[in-house]
């Protein structure tokens, strides 16, 4: 039986307590005007964890610019933060940024079915949205991250740390 560090326990508690994340994507490239640097795109997304395929699941509209950007540039980042507490400073607010690779499983595939099951287990109220033609599941495979447990308590985490934190039964 292995001992889980306090930082790993803290990461697990943070991830399991948050249902939304800020999703950052590379903007669509403007190959005509290469001198103009497009700003990164950020959106708030509900997310779920697929423990079978070790992916974070989001459900997004294909009409959204961030979805189109993910299709062109699958490298993404997610940021989850602890909830602010009245009277406490925000500089030591616990947070984790996760870098990953986004992919859209074909509708009806085993990955799609797993994504749908995991997402609806966490967000059953989203079931009607799964029938909308422009919405799709996106699987984000975690690659690495940065966990800030508090002021002066920051560390890099690898994919295995993230997977272990997201799998409470592991």
Show where each model-derived region lies:
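An N-terminal domain-cap segment
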Residues: 1-71
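General beta-strand recognition
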Residues: 55-57, 77, 146
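Conserved hydrophobic/aromatic beta-strand scaffold that supports enzyme active sites
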Residues: 22, 42-46, 97-99, 137-139, ...
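Short, structured beta-strand-loop surface elements
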Residues: 63-122, 142
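Generic structural signal for secondary-structure transition and capping sites
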Residues: 19-20, 75, 124, 145
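Surface loops and adjacent helix of pleckstrin homology
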Residues: 26, 61, 81, 150-152
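C-terminal edge-of-domain segments
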Residues: 4, 117-118, 122-170
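Short glycine-enriched loop/turn motifs at secondary-structure junctions
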Residues: 51-53, 96, 131
């Amino acid at each position: 039986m292995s001992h889980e560090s306090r930082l790993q326990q803290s990461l697990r508690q943070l991830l399991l307590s948050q249902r939304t994340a800020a999703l950052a994507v590379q903007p669509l490239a403007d190959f005509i005007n290469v001198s103009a640097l497009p700003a990164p795109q950020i959106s708030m997304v509900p997310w779920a964890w697929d423990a079978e395929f070790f992916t974070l699941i989001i459900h997004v509209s294909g009409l959204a610019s961030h979805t189109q950007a993910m299709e062109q540039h699958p490298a993404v980042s997610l940021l989850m933060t602890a909830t602010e507490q009245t009277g406490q400073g925000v500089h030591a607010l616990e947070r984790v940024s996760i870098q990953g690779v986004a992919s859209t499983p074909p509708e009806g595939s085993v990955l799609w079915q797993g994504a749908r099951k995991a997402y609806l287990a966490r967000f059953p109220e989203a079931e009607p949205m799964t029938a909308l033609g422009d919405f799709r599941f996106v699987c984000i495979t975690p690659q690495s991250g940065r966990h800030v447990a508090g002021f002066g308590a920051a560390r890099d985490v690898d994919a295995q740390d993230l997977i272990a934190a997201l799998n409470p039964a592991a």
